[in-house]
Amino acid sequence: MPPMLSGPMAAILLGVAATRLAAPAATVDEPAASSEAPVWRLAWHGYAFLDSNRQDGPSGGRDFESVNHAMLVATRPLGAWTQSLLGTFSIEPATIAPEGSPLLFQRGETYGGVLLIDKQHAHDLFGQLAAEWTRPLPRGTSLRLYAGLRGEPAVGPVAFPHRLSASEFPMAPLSHHNLDSTHISDDVVTAGFTASIVTIEGSLFHGAEPDENRWDLDQGALDSYAGRLTLHPLDALSIQVSACRREEPEALEEGNQTRVTASVGWEKRTAGGFVAALLASGKNELEEGPEWGSLLEAAWRFRTRHVVYGRVERVDRDVYELVNKQQRPETVEPQRTAVDGLTLGYALTVPLLREASTSVGAAVATERFDDRLEPVYGERPVSVWVYLRFGFGSTGGTAHQH
């Protein structure tokens, strides 16, 4: 049954004609393949991993799963404006186990009212349902407006499902909930202004994380806010700093949360493919103190068919939660520890399907952590993914940043 449209964002979207907005913050995937219609220009983009996921050690697990993503954009001129309708979708609620995909040291969201530890939750069916407007102004400036029943507020770097440097990784970053977990938020309104190399954006949105039902929308008050400053000193270089204040974001944690992020991204197309990298760090301000997550990731496609990629991360975790696999009670003193992660992978494009770009790949990951965690994680776990990746669209479903 389709979700009911109600609340403040429904009023905005149903009462206003749509246009091409500066998307969730500074970046929206521009779908690749397109077809011309009398008024609207339609474009689409998508990818799907089919992978065998083996997480090592006593806290590990195994699964056969599919991480996937699709986006549809309809664009048309509307007077002085450009108008777009944006839809982003995933069928991960059907292709990933309800309790999430095995991923050592991951933390965030819930299943059955219990905090997910060593699991990456599935993304919602509706990742974005939004309208967007852009308008050029004098002296090389432009205005962007964005409104979505679900979308991405102006905080963080490009979310990992959409950025080129992460396009071949079959797993989420461990720092996801420090950097870009707001990429699926309910009831988002964003305004942005660009002058030369500078873009300033501000958002209002509903701060609570989506609930455990991954098939619906979760509407609420515009109770949270975000802002971002982005610089593009070179076509390939993007620098952003951002912050947001979220009202009661976590189902199991009382209180509001402040997040601050900064990142430097590089993306360059080449004759044989691309080179892309991201250095990012984010901090969640919690009652027990700051919680940091940082990463450096890169991907290089060369000779058209070959991709090598890697990611280095450091994230803060709570010892009690990692040992007991549940939310730390307020009566237990927090014990923070740093976890370092390393992921390396390779993919090869193969001529399997005419309708899609297909690659076969593998990735390995290992972590360095506190000795106190060895009884529950082993001495040095080594996790492995082996996968097929299908990309749809004229660029093979490869994400990219604007």
Region spans (language model):
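Residues on the lipid-exposed face of transmembrane beta-strands in outer-membrane beta-barrel proteins
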Residues: 46, 70-76, 129-135, 189-195, ...
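Outer membrane beta-barrel transmembrane domains
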Residues: 242-252, 275-288, 293-299, 305-353, ...
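Transmembrane beta-strands of outer-membrane beta-barrel pores
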Residues: 48-56, 89-95, 147-153, 195-197, ...
